[in-house]
Amino acid sequence: MQPSRTRVSFFETGETMKQRKKSYLSIFVIFFSLFFFGIFMYNDNLKSSIADFTSSNPFSSSFVELPPDECDLFTGQWVFDNKTYPLYKEEECEFLTEQVTCLRNGRKDSLFQNWRWQPRDCSLPKFNARVLLEKLRNKRLMFVGDSLNRNQWESMVCLVQSVIPPGRKSLNQTGSLTVFKIQDYNATVEFYWAPFLVESNSDDPEKHSIIDRIIMPESIEKHGVNWIGVDFLVFNSYIWWMNTVSIKVLRGSFDDGDTEYDEIKRPIAYERVLRTLGDWVDHNIDPLSTTVFFMSMSPLHIKSSDWANPEGIRCALETTPILNMSFNVAYGQFSAVGTDYRLFPVAENVTQSLKVPIHFLNITALSEYRKDAHTSVYTIKQGKLLTREQQNDPANFADCIHWCLPGLPDTWNEFLYTHIISRR
């Protein structure tokens, strides 16, 4: 007796095979759906990571195109540009002092903020705060000099502070030194008050309104000890030399209580001071670790007749730069526009004759065109905002020395920025 066999017809086998194929197909579809979903999610995360990197990487947004070394950055013209200038807004920089906040102090026109310096044969790189801060990481940038260098220091603080999160930046003053600290970069942007660079009776950062200003042209160590170890030093000294035709030079020492002095012609005293600075640089600066700059003179705009506006009152009624570039403000018709050009070659020659290089930034001529950019009557005097009556008396109260911010000093810092980011 043979065991019974289960018979499977060909019809039944075909159906089973179809069911198996459907099962395999379903598994295949599910597998590849999960696979492609994973790829999609990975790409999404990758895109997010790339986006995060791009936003935090200062070099990713655009390639910084530097001007060629042979290009003269200081010969060019002012171009109206209300799309990319100003580089920051007055109300967005909490660190600006009342001395320079012209719009807040009542100035109605703001066109002075919209002028861009265009070199004749090249272009300045667009200012990028993150690129600069990377160069300043673990470093110190210090401005040393008078209130015009403080003007430029305030500008630099505003240029970089916008990319720093709240609570990650601070400002502290101790004596002559004011320090803006950027925590995430362990970097500082500092200002050191030394209006004559050498020792003087005007060295108090708060109380220096002295009629008889006296200097010690060969004494710089008291200040210089505070400059040791700084990575980028930016010197200036000019406006305090312009109060008198001659300069009082102390016989002896302030520490010894000496009060007698000699009066020396301004260019001679200026050269003595800059040679003292040069000697200090040569003996104390390692050019491999410290870069030194010297800013040329920041001009005054006191006489409106100098720029062919006999009806003007100092700089008070000026709303546009000198736009006729055929006038040579430095050596031609406008040679008297706020600059003692006897001092210019002194500064240029001394800074270029040292063993340690000093980069001479020639801001003078291009700044002479900017009769419109001063604080004028929209500023303070003796620590207090000008009253309405004082504002209505520009002949006596217009400040045609300092500059509104945002404004011209931002351009000076664009030159400085170009040099710093070009440093290998």
Curated annotation (Swiss-Prot):
Keyword Transmembrane helix belongs to the record: yes
Keywords: Membrane, Signal-anchor, Transmembrane, Transmembrane helix
Pfam families membership: PC-Esterase, PMR5N
Membrane topology: Single-pass type II membrane protein
Cross-referenced InterPro entries: TBL (IPR029962), TBL_C (IPR026057), TBL_N (IPR025846)
A GO CC term attached to the entry: membrane
Span(s) of short sequence motif GDS motif: 145-147
GO MF entries: O-acetyltransferase activity
Principal location: membrane
Entry annotated with the keyword Transmembrane: yes
Segments traversing the membrane: 23-43
Entry's localization field: Membrane
Motif (DCXHWCLPGXXDXWN motif): 399-413
Cysteine-cysteine disulfides: none
Additional notes on this entry: Contains 2 motifs that are conserved in esterases, but it is unlikely that this protein belongs to the catalytically active pectin esterases.
Family classification: Belongs to the PC-esterase family. TBL subfamily.
Function according to Swiss-Prot or TrEMBL: May act as a bridging protein that binds pectin and other cell wall polysaccharides. Probably involved in maintaining esterification of pectins. May be involved in the specific O-acetylation of cell wall polymers.
Protein name: Protein trichome birefringence-like 28
Naturally occurring in which organism (per UniProt): Arabidopsis thaliana (Mouse-ear cress)
